[in-house]
Amino acid sequence: MKRSDLEKDAAYILDKFKQLDYEIPSNRQILKVIFYKLVVVYVFQLLFIIFDIFINSNVRDYHYFDTFVITLGSNAFFSLVFLMSTYNLVSLKISLGSEITEQSVLLKLVERKINSYGQFLMVVNAIVGCVLLSSGERFVAGLGFSWFVTYLISMITLQTSLSRYMTPAVVSSLSKVKELLSASPK
């Protein structure tokens, strides 16, 4: 991908967005997208806990309450970080709409990278879940902490991998789009 192509694409995004009479997304719309992604994490966690109960059912006293509390805490911690880090991006994507998103090479690239990092998170946490499952009773309850750590690592790696595409002109155009989104009426 050439620098000039990226800069033209970023300018295209800015020009189209200036012309767009976009609808400001509601919290409900934004949170719906975010929690749709989080449901996958919760289902993963639930499946591993069910497997843990079946595998460790021969243990005299399975500690259901302890498992529930640890699971709730670890997933709440991850969910909070995930929510805070994705809220603005989801708002931007909804505001840009499908026309701009589908036409932009840069936005398609970012979306592809995010999807591949999402798949990476799924695979790594499935492996971690299996390791925790084989470690013994209730260890799988801490899988939310694994999601947190792998998410942070993935976000840092994603930002690093995208940084080579962020020329000064691209950053300037994207900053102007963000300014347009957050500008308050005078």
Curated annotation (Swiss-Prot):
It comes from the Bacteria. Involved in surface exclusion. Keywords: Conjugation, Plasmid. This is Protein TraS. It comes from Escherichia coli.
